[in-house]
């Protein structure tokens, strides 16, 4: 449903410049005129705009709220607006819909997928459960609604260790989909009956241990902020354990944890191992700190599909709307609620 009328010539002209391609919508600059028009259209639609930490800077700047996916989904549920525009990847918008079933949830480009969420399907999970009857399924929030619906308890990167530790030690646990977060949980809990799915985020998996070690040795006074989805998380802990890098300078953190640490660090330089969009929020939080990417090529092409053109189109056309089957949503909601009952989930991812 369009929110334009005959007087909206500026929006009409801007939308007319939009072109579509397999990599996303283009043709509109994220300038001050665009930002003002986005805010005006959001008000007309009665919408609140949420942006993930990995979004383009101009998308983060125009959003009403910026954060990790679970925190944003909880904000969506509490927001007075009836329409949620979720600037992130598709599973994140699904999670917002699960927690806000009566609201309209829009994503600026429904093609914005996620390699990690796509690494396990409902069929995969059903087959895995059949191989391990009676096992407890723990799924990272970075999963589709259909996978959450087959899950016993969801977890975030902040509370994954606590969630697994809360489960009867005699019961098998199936942890999905991220193999690096799963390895971190196994290492921290010492749990031998924890089975880990071999999924990964292509961006985080590409931040390798050799790269991290080289950067760390070249910057001995820096702190390391390492996301547990990274393929280099084990290398970071190894560097600390071997004394190659001070243990108190190595921090395995969710995106929310990184922001908290940025506000308290005494370091003058921090090496950051996560998607490069996170640097924008970190630098805003602590401008006195020199935040540098361990790998400056670690950019998620799916996150960057949420362009200024895509957001403008979304607000004008009311597209793309996110739908989740009510039965799947109810089952997925229960798995998220069980996680919340165990304790505060902290940063989502």
UniProtKB/Swiss-Prot annotation:
Catalyzes the condensation of iminoaspartate with dihydroxyacetone phosphate to form quinolinate. The gene is nadA. Binds 1 [4Fe-4S] cluster per subunit. Belongs to the quinolinate synthase family. Type 2 subfamily. Its cofactor is [4Fe-4S] cluster. The keyword Metal-binding applies. HAMAP family: NadA_type2. It catalyses: iminosuccinate + dihydroxyacetone phosphate = quinolinate + phosphate + 2 H2O + H(+). Pathway: Cofactor biosynthesis; NAD(+) biosynthesis; quinolinate from iminoaspartate: step 1/1. Keywords: 4Fe-4S, Cytoplasm, Iron, Iron-sulfur, Metal-binding, Pyridine nucleotide biosynthesis, Transferase. Its EC number is 2.5.1.72. This is Quinolinate synthase. The keyword Mitochondrion does not apply. GO terms for cellular component: cytosol. Iminosuccinate binds at residues 52, 69, 140-142, 157, 227-229, 255. GO terms for biological process: 'de novo' NAD biosynthetic process from L-aspartate. NCBIfam families: nadA, PRK09375.1-2, PRK09375.1-4. It is found in: Cytoplasm. Its main location: cytoplasm. [4Fe-4S] cluster binds at residues 114, 201, 300. GO terms for molecular function: 4 iron, 4 sulfur cluster binding; metal ion binding; quinolinate synthetase A activity. It comes from Mycobacterium avium (strain 104). It is an enzyme of class 2 (transferase). It comes from the Bacteria. PANTHER family: QUINOLINATE SYNTHASE, CHLOROPLASTIC, QUINOLINATE SYNTHETASE A.
């Amino acid at each position: 449903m369009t929110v334009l009328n005959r007087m909206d010539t500026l929006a009409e002209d801007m939308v007319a410049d939009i072109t579509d391609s397999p990599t996303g919508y283009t043709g509109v600059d994220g300038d001050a005129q665009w930002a003002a028009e986005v805010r005006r259209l959001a008000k007309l639609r009665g919408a609140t705009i949420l942006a993930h930490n990995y979004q383009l800077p101009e998308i983060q700047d125009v959003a009403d709220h910026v954060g990790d996916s679970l925190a944003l989904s909880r904000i969506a549920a509490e927001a007075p607006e009836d329409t949620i525009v979720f600037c992130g990847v598709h599973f994140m918008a699904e999670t917002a819909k699960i927690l806000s079933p009566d609201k309209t949830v829009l994503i600026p480009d429904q093609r914005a997928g996620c390699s990690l969420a796509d690494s396990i399907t409902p069929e995969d999970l059903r087959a895995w459960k059949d191989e391990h009857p009676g096992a407890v399924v723990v799924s990272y929030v970075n999963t589709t609604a259909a996978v959450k619906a087959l899950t016993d308890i969801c977890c975030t990167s902040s509370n994954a260790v606590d969630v697994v530790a809360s489960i009867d030690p005699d019961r098998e646990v199936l942890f999905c989909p991220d193999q690096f977060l799963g390895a971190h949980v196994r290492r921290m809990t010492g749990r031998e009956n924890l089975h880990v799915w071999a999924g990964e985020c292509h961006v985080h998996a590409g931040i390798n241990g050799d790269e991290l070690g080289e950067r760390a040795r070249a910057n001995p006074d820096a702190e390391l902020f390492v996301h547990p989805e990274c393929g280099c998380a084990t290398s970071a802990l190894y560097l600390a354990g071997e004394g190659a890098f001070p243990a108190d300078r190595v921090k395995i953190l969710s995106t929310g944890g990184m922001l908290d640490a940025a506000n308290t660090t005494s370091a003058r330089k921090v090496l950051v191992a996560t998607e490069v969009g996170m640097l924008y929020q970190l630098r805003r939080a602590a401008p006195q700190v020199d935040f540098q990417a361990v790998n400056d090529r670690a950019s998620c092409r799916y996150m960057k599909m949420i362009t200024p053109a895509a957001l403008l189109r979304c607000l004008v056309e009311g597209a793309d709307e996110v739908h989740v089957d009510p039965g799947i949503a109810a089952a997925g909601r229960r798995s998220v609620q069980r996680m919340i009952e165990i304790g505060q989930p902290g940063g989502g991812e």
